[in-house]
Amino acid sequence: MDIDYRIAIVLAPVVIAASWAVFNIGAAALRQIQGFLDREA
């Protein structure tokens, strides 16, 4: 049974975009949380 590479070709850009978005949002969220914790202290 051969693997259908068309699925990988279609999903690859979606996975890359999603991981890039999670990385950027995660970095911004961490900065916001750190700023909030710094204000509390």
Curated annotation (Swiss-Prot):
This is Photosystem II reaction center protein Y. Loosely associated component of the core of photosystem II (PSII), it is not always seen in crystals. PSII is a light-driven water plastoquinone oxidoreductase, using light energy to abstract electrons from H(2)O, generating a proton gradient subsequently used for ATP formation. The chain crosses the membrane at residues 7-25. It comes from the Bacteria. It comes from Nostoc punctiforme (strain ATCC 29133 / PCC 73102). The keyword Transmembrane applies. Keywords: Membrane, Photosynthesis, Photosystem II, Thylakoid, Transmembrane, Transmembrane helix. Belongs to the PsbY family. GO terms for cellular component: photosystem II; plasma membrane-derived thylakoid membrane. The lineage of its organism: Bacteria, Bacillati, Cyanobacteriota, Cyanophyceae, Nostocales. NCBIfam families: PRK13240.1. The gene is psbY.
